[in-house]
Swiss-Prot record:
It comes from Psychromonas ingrahamii (strain DSM 17664 / CCUG 51855 / 37). Part of the 30S ribosomal subunit. Keywords: Ribonucleoprotein, Ribosomal protein. This is Small ribosomal subunit protein uS10. PROSITE patterns: RIBOSOMAL_S10.
Amino acid sequence: MQNQRIRIRLKAFDHKLIDQSTAEIVETAKRTGAQVRGPIPLPTRKERFTILVSPHVNKDARDQYEIRTHKRLIDIVEPTEKTVDALMKLDLAAGVDVQISLG
């Protein structure tokens, strides 16, 4: 797997969960002898929703809600076979979306 790179993108609503998962991935990759770049924090996406509280009148009465999507990027440079096997066996939290691409 020389001259290869594994790029891992993580997404989660909870920043503590995504930081914990990133730490696990980085620790696993370093333990197997791969060089790690990151974790790189990507911009947080904030979705805001405004909802009318009253069903009929009172346009001024509104509630506002927000969902934040936190993102991290990890590059694993020159991964070994042990690195790939260890990453495949890694069990991450349920609230974290993981996208892996080889480049």
